[in-house]
C-alpha cells in the first residue's frame, strides 16, 4: 500500500504527509516517554526488520562503505540488525573479517539466514560487549547510539574503546536547532542533542574525535558522523 501511495502522490504531498505524521508522533509520545528506559521490544517486530532493510539507502550506507574503504583486519558492526551493512562491506572489503552484534536475536537470525557466518554474529547488549581488549581494528554503528539511555551511551563508548584498537565510527542524528532537546520519541526513543554533547561523550575515552556531515536528515535532525580515534 505504501509503495502504491508513493507512486500516486506528488513528492510535495508525500513530504507534507510525512511531516504531519512526524509531528503527530512527537506530540503523542511526549507524555509517555520514560527517561531511563529504552524501547527494546521494537527490535523483535518484523516491521522494524523491514525498515532496517531500507532506511539508509542512498545515504549512510554509502558513507560507511567509503569510510571503511580499503580497511583490513577485524571490523565490528554494533547493532548490526539484519546484517545489510556487513554484506555490503564483504564486497568492498574482501580482506576484512566482519563481525556483527545486536540485542535482538530475531534480527541476528535474519542476518544468519542471509549467509553471514554464525561465529561472526552475537546477540548481546552493546553495554555488555565481552570481546577481548583490542580484538577489533575498527568498529562502527549507524543510527544506534542515540537510542541508549544517557548512562548506556557512556557504557557503550567504554566498551568500544576497550575492544577497538584503531578507530570507531558512529553516525547519529543531532538537533537541527543545535540544542540539547534531550530524550524524545518518534517511532522509538532517542537523544536529539547537539554536536558538542556527543563530542564530550566520545572524548571521555577517545583522544581524537572528528565530526563529518552525513547526507541523512529528517524533520528535526541532521546526520553526523563521529570519527573517534584512540591516538
For every predicted segment, state its role:
Residues 159-163:
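Conserved helix-to-beta-strand junction in the class I
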Residues 140:
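A conserved beta-strand element that flanks and buttresses the S-adenosyl-L-methionine
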Residues 143-147:
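Short catalytic micro-motifs in class I SAM-dependent methyltransferases
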Residues 3-74, 78-130, 148-155, 167-231:
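Class I (Rossmann-like) S-adenosyl-L-methionine-dependent methyltransferase catalytic domain
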Amino acid at each position: 500500500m505504501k509503495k502504491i501511495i508513493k507512486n500516486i502522490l506528488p513528492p510535495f504531498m508525500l513530504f507534507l504527509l510525512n511531516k504531519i505524521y512526524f509531528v503527530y508522533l512527537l506530540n503523542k509520545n511526549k507524555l509517555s516517554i520514560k527517561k531511563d528506559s529504552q524501547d527494546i521490544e521494537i527490535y523483535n517486530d518484523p516491521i522494524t526488520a523491514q525498515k532496517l532493510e531500507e532506511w539508509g539507502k542512498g545515504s549512510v550506507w554509502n558513507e560507511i562503505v567509503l569510510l571503511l574503504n580499503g580497511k583490513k583486519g577485524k571490523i565490528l558492526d554494533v547493532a548490526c540488525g539484519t546484517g545489510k551493512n556487513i554484506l555490503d562491506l564483504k564486497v568492498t572489503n574482501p580482506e576484512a573479517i566482519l563481525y556483527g552484534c545486536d540485542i535482538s536475536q530475531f534480527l541476528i537470525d535474519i542476518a544468519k539466514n542471509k549467509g553471514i557466518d554464525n561465529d561472526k554474529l552475537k546477540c548481546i547488549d552493546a553495554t555488555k560487549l565481552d570481546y577481548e581488549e583490542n580484538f577489533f581494528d575498527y568498529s562502527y554503528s549507524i543510527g544506534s547510539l542515540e537510542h541508549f539511555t544517557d548512562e548506556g551511551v557512556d557504557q557503550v563508548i567504554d566498551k568500544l574503546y576497550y575492544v577497538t584498537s584503531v578507530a570507531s565510527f558512529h553516525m547519529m542524528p543531532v538537533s537541527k536547532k543545535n540544542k540539547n532537546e534531550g530524550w524524545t520519541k518518534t517511532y522509538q526513543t532517542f537523544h536529539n542533542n547537539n554536536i558538542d554533547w556527543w563530542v564530550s561523550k566520545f572524548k571521555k575515552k577517545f583522544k581524537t574525535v572528528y565530526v563529518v556531515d552525513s547526507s541523512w536528515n529528517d524533520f528535526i535532525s541532521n546526520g553526523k558522523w563521529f570519527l573517534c580515534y584512540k591516538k
